[in-house]
């Protein structure tokens, strides 16, 4: 608590928050950089060690427990090791999976007044559409029911308020313009490395921006045990910017004097560490160990750590206003000050109802009108920026308070993030889980390297007294290496001591021949240990070899899928927290866009999912009237559907359930709801085409049946006419024969018919007429039956067509 005693008092009227008061707040923050005051965050050194480990740099002090578990001071303990980043591949697997996960969101209006207005607009529009359908008498009952069902589906699933439509299109536009998925992917890497994921939303040049915050460069104060960065009462961001970036960001608030200071800043550390009286400021060189962490032991007293190696590769000092690369130190402070507001009770002059409104502290209460007042002290987000040691800009209340209409005290700084901790404790990140195994792997691999270097194989013992006279060792090694001959001279006389003048071969100096230095078994043991360490790391992290794509030949497809699925369950908690951070960050970005667009119209080309563009214009004042929230669908079913989309699309293409163009759009669309609408629309079009084809087929069949009926009727008519002509011919012949004389052509005389013959002829004619009448009746019956059969067929075809359309 003593560290905050020097912080200026915040419960002051706005008139007393002078420029000097604001500078004092920033100067207090200038003394607190690099320190860790959060109860749920790891120290900066701990995070720096993790980041360096992923970048291939080892902190040997962090390996002491592995290299020297007994704490023995010995020269054989190595002071440097070669690092083998076996954990990086597992982190990259998760990073790749994050980039492919579905994050399907939809912007909705959340404030109650706007929701009521949306309900009224939806109701009025629905009633208008229903009235138009009722008054339209040209449609049948079946068509009316179909349109009513479509209308119900539209207003249930697809209808959106115009503000929600604009918010969705605006957010999708900025997501593509800023490549926000890549920003989130980098933040997910921070979460796996140090257990923190933080983003900042702000307004730069009149445009809303979102950036990832480096966990090494942010200090959080007074956040309690909350794992949300938004709950902090004070945040310090410390970074080194190039002079060009400083001017780009603050050009509208920098004076010519400030620009001159930036152009003439010092360019070496000694110039800043010594003041005008040649006094050395020791704060620039060392930091109190108690404020850092327990990762590095104290040496030479309390002050030990040189922060010059924290930010970059030894060219920056976190307490200097510049670094050796020509960059300026930019210190940004965000804190919650106190503001007095008045809650005034008044009465509507027309209805007499009570009304409550909030006013600033300088509001004059009109007691004659019956106004009553209550005063409250609420939180107000402030900001300030210190550039170098002399430039102070933007010391003011935040332009964006990120508060809600129902709570004027709720606010934050536009810095959104989460600590991946458990039960109010400090985070234990994925890198922290795997780091001991990677250290052990490096130590064992160092032994393996030394064992391989010392594995000389079989060594020949050489007695120099037997080397032939006049030969040196190099010549002898040449014959042994090239000719594989070990030459000895047993008659060479000794030259030293008691052996002088004696033959070397007569001495009892027979060598042992070969010395075996082969340590292959030891090397194999080290290799087995390395494989064991990899397996243990995979089990602890929950990232199996199958998930990394390392599959042996004996594994089955089902076994690999099961192993991958179980592995994904272990790491799902990381993605759950990450999706929540993404949701809050996008909501914060929308709030930032509201203030950035207020007072002007935003006209932009909205980039659709298929890379086509659409011009959209948004009224900033109307857009800022509502509060917005995100509805996210990232359930397991959604993720599984995304994974199976390839198989389903291929099956749909083979069965011609979907068109090829629709399948290509499915892969370019990022919204699951849009994919469902594309599939439903294409299925509807295919059904309509199939129904139209069936209708045309039925019409063709009906035409063929009609033509066949006409042909059959023509044949019957022709047959009837032929029968009539034949009968008439027979009657005429009979009449001629009955009335005519003898046939003289053939010279045969035929007597006249007798009465009996005439009677027989008349009887035959009568029988023929009756038979002709029966044939006519039968022909009429056949014709009527054919018409009935054709009518039945037409009705059956119509019934089949209507059933297919339904």
Swiss-Prot record:
Gene Ontology CC: one annotated term: viral capsid
Region (Interaction with Cargo protein 1): 337-380
Biased composition (Basic and acidic residues): 783-792
Localization: Virion
Key word Ribonucleoprotein present: no
Entry keyword set: Capsid protein, Viral capsid assembly, Viral genome packaging, Viral release from host cell, Virion
Key word RNA-binding present: no
Region Disordered, annotated ranges: 783-806
Skewed-composition ranges (Basic residues): 795-806
Record text on subunit structure and interactions: Homododecamer. Interacts with the Cargo protein 1. Interacts with the major capsid protein.
Function: Forms the portal vertex of the capsid. Probably involved in head assembly, genome packaging, tail attachment, and genome ejection.
Name under which the protein is recorded: Portal protein
High-level lineage: Viruses, Duplodnaviria, Heunggongvirae, Uroviricota, Caudoviricetes
